[in-house]
């Protein structure tokens, strides 16, 4: 579902299509890749672009201005790359492998209330490669904070959070990959939910979500922000120990 926070725009006198003038664009990158560049195209030949090597979880405040767009149907093309793979390629004096992605976005007519240059079309890039549009009159609006999740994880678990002594950037990207997986598999977005997902996946058991009691929690808390995190924190030490020792082939035994 595409999110539009407002309801009606100015319309072209020669058609009923909405027209957005003097619009800035910013991207919020929730993928596990660095977002190098993006282009938004409407069906009338207009385009807007931005990017600038946005690391996972970043984008707020990075605005490109000013553009005109028209209509309700758009195509978004963007380039991403894996920062860990890129570093190896740089060390080997090779070109960085860039991945091109494309998505189509439908946005109902949206009212733009700010003055020219104050309106921002926020593009939310999700881990499953779908994109959502949202008009804003500020430079905020991030829906997933990987940085806060990783800061909590590193502060709370110390050496256990980074047992192989990766540098901060690599350790952060590892956290991001797991958190992004939590979104793709279960739609988790809140800090509480992602904190617990990362902890259990990286420290307790990478397949913890296949444990019957955890699967029950995932079903019962679906669509309820923070509920998964709260439920996982309440598990007894004995249950956590069982999850740590759990193997998927034992599932039927555990149920019995």
PLM segments and residue spans:
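Sec-dependent N-terminal signal peptides
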Residues: 1-5
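C-terminal motif of bacterial Sec signal peptides marking the signal peptidase cleavage site
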Residues: 6-10
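Bacterial signal peptide processing site
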Residues: 12-14
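Solvent-exposed loop and beta-edge segments used for protein-protein assembly and interaction
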Residues: 19, 32, 68-70, 97-99, ...
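Structural motif
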Residues: 23-33
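Short, ordered, surface-exposed loop/turn motifs in non-cytosolic proteins
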Residues: 32-42
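Tryptophan-paired
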Residues: 40-85
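Beta-strand-rich cores of mature extracytoplasmic or soluble domains
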Residues: 84-256
């Amino acid at each position: 579902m595409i999110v539009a926070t407002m309801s009606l725009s100015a319309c072209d006198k020669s058609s009923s299509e909405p027209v957005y003038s003097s619009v800035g664009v910013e991207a919020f990158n929730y993928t596990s890749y660095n977002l190098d560049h993006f282009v938004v195209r409407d069906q009338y030949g207009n385009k807007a672009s931005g990017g600038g090597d946005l690391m996972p979880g970043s984008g707020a405040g990075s605005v490109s201005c000013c553009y005109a767009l028209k209509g309700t149907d758009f195509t978004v093309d963007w380039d991403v790359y894996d920062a860990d793979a890129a570093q190896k390629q740089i060390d080997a004096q090779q070109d960085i492998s860039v991945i091109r992605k494309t998505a189509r976005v439908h946005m109902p007519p949206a009212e733009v209330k700010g003055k020219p240059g104050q309106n921002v079309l926020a593009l939310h890039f999700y881990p499953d490669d779908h994109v959502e549009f949202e008009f804003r009159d500020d430079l905020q609006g991030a829906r997933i904070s990987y940085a806060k999740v990783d800061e909590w994880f590193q502060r709370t678990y110390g050496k256990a959070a980074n047992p192989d002594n990766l540098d901060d950037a690599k350790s952060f990207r590892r956290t991001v990959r797991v958190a992004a997986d939590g979104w793709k598999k279960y739609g988790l977005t809140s800090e509480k939910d992602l904190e617990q997902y990362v902890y259990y996946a990286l420290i307790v058991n990478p397949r913890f979500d296949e444990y019957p009691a955890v699967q029950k929690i995932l079903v019962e808390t679906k669509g309820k922000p923070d509920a998964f995190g709260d439920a996982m924190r309440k598990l007894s030490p004995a249950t956590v120990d069982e999850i740590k020792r759990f193997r998927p082939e034992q599932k039927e035994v555990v149920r019995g």
